[in-house]
Amino acid sequence: GERVTLKAGRSRFVLATLPATDFPVIDELAQQQALTLAQADLRRLLDKTHFSMAQQDVRYYLNGMLFETDGKMLRTVATDGHRLALCEMDMPTKSGVQQVIIPRKGVLELQRLLGTEGEVTITIGSNHVRAQIGDVRFTSKLIDGRFPEYSRVIPSAPQKAIVADREVLRAALQRTAILANEKYRGIRLALKKNSLTL
């Protein structure tokens, strides 16, 4: 087989290699849409929704994140069938209407690569998505499936709305979560006028 030799100072390493022809070749992306936005904006969209992705669901289309443009808004949506997270932002430039599902591993890798400064260019093809971040080009396959119609489960005109101090509610949920167990994972919310009991 092929070998590669590495030399550094007085050290010498000979390593066996695999045939380069076996390395998967990603076809040239047949671009359907490209958009450029701030890395911080894309990172925020991913950070706010990634926790709701399924991990090993038989409904394979849930093991990723919906990346959607409707011409005016850019939206990320994730659900595992029990919870749903959605985050959106105004599009920096006008774009076409498109929905693609990026696999969980691709989303997590993108989060790792994205910084807080500079821009990222997202190119969407029929089977792949590509992110150009500085001199790094990241390409991921897309999940071939139909994401659930998430808009049907989000109330358009909710009958009741709760307004609470975010940190106070978070602290209360963390305290009650201590008593949640494998059998009963839920936390019951009891609403009364001007009070919420967990």
Locate predicted features.
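Structural preference for solvent-exposed beta-strand-turn elements
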Residues: 1-198
